[in-house]
Amino acid sequence: MREGGHYPGQCRKKAGLKALDPDTGAADAAHIRAKEIVQSFSHTRPDGRTCFTAASDLGVSYRTAGENIAYGYQTPEQVVQGWMNSEGHRKNILSSSFTKIGVGCYEKGGVLYWSQFFIG
């Protein structure tokens, strides 16, 4: 899902920010979260813990983190455009606090579930 990290980079470049570096740990957390939001479309995990425990459970260290979630979009470009049209999601994409990104996508019943996981 590398292209999922490409489109936020374009948005950041337009805003005069450095692109986010792809991160394997953040991507692994994003993949876990994309599967989980099928059960519970929330930043709280199905077990009741915060979404950020998906990264810490994997041993990913970070000082700051953020998450964007979505479903129903068919392409990385469409989902990023949807996030950019939402103030809270746009803040995550354009935050100078984040330096790395991981993107996850999971398909269930013909519907795509998306997660962006940001760390800094």
Label for each model-derived stretch:
Residues 71-120:
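Disulfide-stabilized extracellular recognition modules
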Residues 1-39:
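A short alpha-helix/helix-coil micro-patch that ends at or immediately precedes a cysteine
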Residues 27-74:
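Short, surface-exposed glycine/acidic/tryptophan-bearing loops
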Residues 3-4, 47, 85:
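Residue-level preference for nonpolar/small residues embedded in alpha-helices
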Residues 14, 35-39, 52, 89, ...:
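Extracytoplasmic/cell-surface-exposed regions of Actinobacterial cell-envelope-associated
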Residues 22, 26, 51, 65, ...:
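Hydrophobic side chains within well-formed alpha-helices
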